[in-house]
């Protein structure tokens, strides 16, 4: 398992690097171990066989005890300090047939040893004085505990291995035969501590025959190992486990000399020593301390040997796993070969099946072709019989079509004759249309001349209106001046002169009124002529449309001809042409009628808009009335035929009667102080004598006149609608 070996070598190399970093970097022993690890990693890098991560994980889970779930940093914080921190030194222990312990085992073992060291320090502190050697060792253990909390677990593992090597100070090589040089490091540390506590350097203490150990205390190295290996290994992660020395070791810890007052002896190990020998007491204390250290190192060595046995067992399990992996790979290779042979066999079988399928498809296609040819022959026989029957039917239809062709030929000749007749009628209608167009153009010219005449008349009327208005204003001003003058110069004796002057004034007013009425008569006669001309034009247009309509009805009436039944079946294009022409003529006549109505309405609106300032003197109430009557007569003439137009004209009231009514209204609106009574006669117009009235009567009369004129206008508008 190359990955596990590389990780083990990486852990060992980290231990060495951290020891060099936190310990003595110039130690030649550590440098030699590092170089040996590098050489061993480069020489044994190709050993081992790969295994899957699942197998290695399963093997490690089955061999490692249940440990705590907390993961300590494995020295990654020091990976960037050295370039060769990840060098391949994974086979360093493999050269000596050993492997490093796993991370969980090393962690549990370090926790156990730290707890054991703390218990030993506390026990020594209770036996010795506070200022003696035990206090110094307790301080050392406390400093080690702080350092373990500050450093990583890999540094603790390296310290553990160094302490194991220091336990055998007289043996040049440890039990693992891996790194004998590491034992000098901790021995130097012990010598330094002894030099601190004991300044003078002396040789080894002499042998004292009177200080003999008890038989229970003198245990050989193999017996101590046997005592540890006969027991089951303790749970390293348990917090309730406490390690106490065995019962035969109790006299060793309790054999310290008991100090007595001066002049008495000291009992040590069952022997009496003079109390005044100070050097002897120091040697006894040093001997006891060294014994305790040897015992602690022996225990540590036993623990390390048990850890090495556990590592050996793990390596054996790993070898077993590698063998199983090799067997599994061989089995997989065998199965792969079998599967490849099976795939080849299936390919051959598939090829045979494909060939058989192609042969079957070809046979089936041949059978289908034969069946199709048989069905096609049967269908051809049936089609031949159908064709024979169809041929007989077509021969009968051919004979029938020949007879109908002769009939169609006769009809064509009749249609040609009808076409010639229609063309002749079309030429006649075109000539008539040209004549009517010339007549329409003549009417349009007359209408334009009439419009010019009306414009000239309107200009003249406007001029006369302005002149009359100015003269009336001057007359009013002169009359007012004359009346004021007469009022100022009037006296009670001149009543007759005033009456004569008033009569003369009334006479002049009546003469002016007569002149105004004569001017109105002349103007209304002119307007009547214009309206009659417009009505005549409308009547002519309506008569033309009615005559054309009558002609169309006569031409399209049914005739008793030999080909009448045939003509009814076939619609003639000439008939459509004639209908379109008639429709065009009717629309043109309606257009002319509407033009005439529009012109009359425009004239009336212009007259109404041109005379707003004369409303007080003489409101033009008669103009809309005449225009409305003329428009109504024109509308009636346009909407009916020629006979209807004549009837409508006869039904209208006589023109002199209308003029009399209009003149009466005009005369009643011209004078503010008089109320004339107009009587319309067929031949003449009589004007009654005026009577003086008040302003209220004149206003009521004007209101009545306005209401009557508005009612007449409403009636005319309803007639037009």
UniProtKB/Swiss-Prot annotation:
Protein name: Angiomotin-like 2a
Record note on what altering residue 103 to F does: Loss of phosphorylation. Drastic reduction in SRC-binding and in activation of MAPK
Assembly information from the UniProt record: Interacts with SRC.
UniProt record similarity statement: Belongs to the angiomotin family.
Pfam family, one: Angiomotin_C
Organism listed in the record: Danio rerio
Location of the motif PDZ-binding: 718-721
Tissue and organ expression note: Expressed in endothelial cells.
The encoding gene: amotl2a
